[in-house]
Amino acid sequence: MAFFELPGPAQRLRTDIAAARPNDQRWQVFEGDCNQSLPTALASLEEVRWAPTFAFVDPRGVQVAWTTVTALADWRRDKKKTKVEQWILMPEPALARVLGLRGVHGRRSAERLDRLFGSRDWLPIHQGRRNGTLTADAMRAEFVNLYRWQLENHLGYQTTHALQIVNTAGHPVYTLIFATDSPPGDAIMGHLYGSAVTSMIPEMQARAQVARQHRREDESGLARLPGMDEFAIEAAKGTPGSYQHQPPWRPTPVVDEALDLEGEPDIDPDDIYWDDDAEAADDDSRS
């Protein structure tokens, strides 16, 4: 087992694991930025690369680079079996603060999003939120969908699941994205998500249903009335508390590469206190 932590917490983690499992030496804690230490960790696990592997990616904010997720996906690819299963936590407050109505908070936040997604394919979503086309909920759904789309279509995962966790006030706290090639893993996670007292993002579920309906209409040559998508999405929203797997839909392609940062303070994303409560972050996304 490989664990990743910053230097201070890393030492405490070593102490806790050693106390809990004094006779077990099958673990190692790697200090520092996981984006930099992952290659060393994977090299240390080379002898067990044949084994099914699970990675829990739990960042504070939006620090994990797409190159890190890609490295995990590639690690067992030549084994012609399943890739590393990834369970990735996407913090909703982080998305709300960096990607809210006021837009990306300066050039450094834009660069952090480039690193998070591995490209600037997030730009149409930012533009939609900026011009009022997307609500805060729709923005979150689109960003999570983009991440899932890339996991399946860029990295080749067969299935992804997305589950939104909310607090007692009903405000989003984070979304858990699970990516797998394993039918048993798919079945187990689908069952766990369905059994949890949680819900899939209603906005995402509805948009996926409408996107599939659009594809069927396009294949049949049927015309659609302009401006009706949001009405269809509202009508398609499911019952809160239920989980139904929906595949990601094709994200909006980048057409206009202009990034409007007028009036935006150039805030370093590492200076944002991500542990503020979700309700405050949600308010930021609506302002």
Regions found by a protein language model. Give the residues of each.
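Class I S-adenosyl-L-methionine-dependent methyltransferase catalytic core
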Residues: M1-S287
